[in-house]
């Protein structure tokens, strides 16, 4: 290697400590300098010198990294592919990837991954759901056919959740969040794109229209208007707005479920484990604080094989303590066992006199909830309710 090239190479190595530069010699093995991901291979002395000189002349210039592209259809866009694109961009592989919107097969096939178009689903490069033969759902428990949003979420969702939360992908909590986000958010997008109504036709006409406030309708409203000039630039810009709208909602939901909803499950799990310490019946749980417990309780009961056994939960409301009856289902107003009929609608001293328990505050007229000034008082109310 000539002196000038060697000097430039040494300078380049110091200037780019994170790059891997392999200098190919005529006879000897390549000389490899430590790096992370980028590898520059110089096939000739003149090419090496030119690249090095250019880098030295432009310190801020980065060595070009090949960027992967995401393909989808052009024309009117919808909530499902808008979300699918955003989800892909949350992965390291497609972070900040440009989107190619087209229906031209060669143009699309030049992309690294294609969503919502081509009529092919191979779970590697093509993720379309419009073909007549497509019947895939999220799992055996779900009957809703996937859209491009559901497809991308099904195969990239756990990776995304792990990356956004910092929880290892193999951690059971990732599976819980993965299922929750699909059931509470993604599935509705799948259903909407596939023309599936949330209500049977026998339910009759809705009392009012909610189209203007649903995410799919808001995305539809971002499409260029029929009576204005429409260019690819305008359409693509509006698509990016739609993708961000859908993605922001997804990220917000993941943030809530991982930081607020999921920690509540741990509280319920702990309360179930300690239920016999609270009362020998095992039918009373002390949650300690108010939290979104109901759904978790039903899930934990089923996991532990104690379905239907819990009757009441206790928790602090910041000023006193509440006793709440467990409903028959997580969305039901019917309770497994409501608070005693004779307590319902009675308050304060009258309630304390009636029950013989100090500190009573109230019992709701329906018997689903009551209050006491102290934990001891609320626990005694729960014990009496279990016994009656």
Language-model-detected regions and their locations in the chain:
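Hydrophobic, aromatic-enriched interface-forming segments
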Residues: 186-290
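Short amphipathic alpha-helical surface micro-motifs
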Residues: 96-98, 170-171, 266-268, 304-306
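Gly/His-enriched, cation/cofactor- and phosphate-binding structural elements
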Residues: 266, 273-388
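Short, flexible coil/linker elements and helix-boundary hinge sites characteristic
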Residues: 4, 14, 58, 64, ...
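N-terminal mitochondrial targeting presequence
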Residues: 1-45
């Amino acid at each position: 290697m000539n002196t000038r090239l060697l000097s430039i190479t040494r300078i380049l190595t110091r200037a780019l400590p994170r790059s891997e530069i392999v200098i190919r010699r005529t006879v000897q093995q390549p000389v490899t300098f430590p790096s992370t991901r980028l590898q520059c291979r110089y096939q000739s002395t003149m090419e090496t010198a030119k690249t090095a000189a250019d880098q030295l002349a432009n310190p801020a210039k980065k060595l070009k990294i090949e960027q992967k592209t995401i393909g989808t259809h052009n024309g009117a866009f919808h909530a499902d592919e808008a979300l699918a694109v955003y989800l892909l961009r949350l992965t390291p592989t497609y972070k900040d990837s440009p989107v190619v919107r087209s229906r031209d097969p060669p143009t699309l096939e030049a992309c690294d991954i294609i969503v919502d178009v081509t009529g092919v689903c191979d779970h590697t490069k093509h993720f379309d759901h419009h073909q007549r033969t497509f019947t895939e759902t999220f799992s055996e428990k779900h009957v809703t056919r996937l859209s491009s949003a559901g497809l991308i979420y099904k195969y990239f969702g756990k990776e995304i959740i792990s990356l956004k939360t910092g929880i290892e992908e193999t951690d059971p909590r990732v599976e819980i969040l993965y299922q929750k986000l699909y059931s509470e958010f993604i599935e509705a997008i799948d259903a909407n794109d596939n023309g599936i109504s949330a209500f049977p036709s026998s339910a009759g006409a809705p009392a009012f229209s909610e189209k203007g406030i649903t995410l799919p309708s808001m995305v539809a409203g971002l499409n260029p208007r029929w009576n204005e000039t429409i260019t690819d630039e305008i359409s693509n810009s509006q698509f990016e707005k739609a993708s961000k709208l859908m993605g922001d909602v997804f990220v917000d939901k993941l943030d809530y479920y991982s930081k607020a909803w999921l920690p509540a499950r741990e509280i319920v799990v702990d309360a179930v484990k300690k239920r016999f310490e609270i009362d020998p019946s095992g039918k009373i749980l002390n949650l300690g604080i108010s939290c979104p417990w109901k759904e978790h309780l039903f899930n934990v009961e089923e996991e532990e094989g104690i379905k239907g056994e819990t009757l009441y939960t206790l928790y602090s409301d910041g000023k006193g303590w509440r006793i709440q009856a467990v409903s028959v289902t997580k969305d039901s107003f019917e309770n497994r066992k409501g608070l005693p009929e004779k307590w319902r609608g009675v308050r304060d001293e009258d309630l304390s006199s009636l029950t013989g328990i100090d500190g009573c505050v109230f019992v709701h007229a329906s018997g689903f909830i009551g209050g006491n000034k102290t934990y001891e008082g609320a626990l005694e109310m729960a014990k009496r309710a279990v016994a009656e």
